[in-house]
Amino acid sequence: MELDHSVVPVKDKEAYSKQIAHVMGWTFLGVRGSQGHVRVNDSLVLRFDDKDPNANRKASHYAFHVDAGEFDGILERAKAEGMTYGTNTREANMEWNDLHGGRRTFLHDLEGHSYELMEAASPPALD
């Protein structure tokens, strides 16, 4: 079983979809209806929806296992776009920490969503 897609509420589907696709190194597929579609990998599409741009939205959190080159590239593009990142979902200290033998940081966007980047995957079981 694989996750096919998830819908993320945003204020401007097209601008947001293009920016996050650029920063994360994903593919902007285009806009259909109230959603901007972004291909993350072969099996996952994120749909950024602005059906109700004035709605009281809750922030979402997404975690991605990335390699060292992806980690560095994403942070470089995020800084160029004016995005902040930090050692947790609330910190914008422009730092990363170590987790399970790899670097980890949290990108913060203007919508309140956070994107966790982890060089080491989550452990297979809780200790």
Tell me the role of every PLM-derived stretch.
Residues 33-36, 97, 124-125:
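Short glycine/proline-centered loop/turn elements that form peptide/ligand docking sites
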Residues 43-47, 55-56, 113:
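Short, charged/polar, Gly/Pro-enriched secondary-structure boundary elements
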Residues 1-15, 62, 121-127:
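N-terminal beta-strand motif that seeds the catalytic metal site of vicinal oxygen chelate
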Residues 7-46:
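Core segments of cupin and vicinal oxygen chelate
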Residues 1-2, 55-59, 98-99:
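Short glycine-enriched loop/turn motifs at secondary-structure junctions
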Residues 5-7, 37, 61-63, 104-106:
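Short aromatic/hydrophobic contact patches that present stacked aromatics
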